[in-house]
Amino acid sequence: MKAGSIASSPGKLKIMNLLAKKELDAGRIAKSTRIPLNIVKWLLDELEKDGLVEQEAGSYKATEEGIKALKALKM
């Protein structure tokens, strides 16, 4: 499971917690998490490569696999 990818970075964890609730664009994620936009974009690319988030029309959302990985961390 990819929970280790999320657990390896506090920024990834913040982003996944947001995206598990709703779809957001990178700018809104940066504002909500207070993480610089360039770092948010880099983290989103990493999460997307791992199959934990997906982008559609400029917005990001957690995938089913991403939600499962996030739940595994909370157990």
Swiss-Prot record:
Alphabetical list of SUPFAM superfamilies matching this protein: Winged helix' DNA-binding domain
Pfam families: HTH_45 (PF14947)
Organismal lineage: Archaea, Methanobacteriati, Methanobacteriota, Archaeoglobi, Archaeoglobales
Protein name per the record: Uncharacterized protein AF_1808
Domain of life where this protein originates: Archaea
InterPro entries: ArnR1-like_HTH, WH-like_DNA-bd_sf, WH_DNA-bd_sf
